[in-house]
């Protein structure tokens, strides 16, 4: 990280270069030292900025997954309500419409999740996993937990297996958090 003393040292070298105008060699040495110090500071500032950008990307992905988990929970709650309805009510036209809406909502959740996972994969390709393991670990969780749960929830909703769908939706929500 950039320290106050490094900045003070560079400023002092620049001031010395300006003050020692009679001795060109000393002035040049101070100016070159200050220039080299400025370059180091610039490189450090660029690194700090890149680290900040990376953290912003992580925060944005985390925030979007949290919002998506909330959407998944709402969808799960509606699935539970539908599953609790008497079997005879499931054959009514309104229940069929509700089931179709559940299916569309779940497909939308899966699509948005796929979009976020794609960004995570891009981030994983850019970063060295030994220095920044979070994208790789998140992708492992996606493959092991999220993808199967989302796929199972959608398949179960399409097959009118609402209790199983609710369980898969719960697992998907848990994997998003």
Where do the PLM segments sit?
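Mature extracytoplasmic or organellar-lumen-exposed domains after removal of signal/transit peptides
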Residues: 1-177
């Amino acid at each position: 990280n950039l320290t106050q003393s490094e900045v003070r040292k560079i400023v002092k070298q620049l001031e010395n270069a300006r003050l020692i105008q009679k001795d060109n060699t000393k002035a040049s040495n101070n100016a070159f030292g200050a220039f080299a110090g400025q370059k180091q500071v610039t490189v450090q500032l660029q690194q700090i900025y890149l680290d900040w950008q990376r953290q912003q990307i992580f925060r944005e992905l985390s925030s979007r997954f949290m919002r998506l988990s909330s959407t998944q929970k709402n969808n799960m709650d509606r699935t539970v309500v539908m599953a609790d309805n008497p079997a005879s009510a499931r054959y009514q036209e309104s229940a069929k419409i509700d089931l179709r809406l559940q299916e569309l909502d779940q497909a939308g959740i899966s699509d948005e999740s796929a979009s976020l996972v794609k960004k995570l994969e891009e981030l994983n390709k850019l970063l060295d996993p030994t220095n920044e393991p979070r994208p790789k670990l998140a992708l492992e969780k996606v493959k092991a937990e999220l993808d199967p749960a989302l796929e199972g929830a959608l398949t179960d909703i399409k097959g009118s297996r609402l209790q199983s769908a609710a369980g898969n939706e719960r697992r998907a929500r848990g994997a998003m958090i």
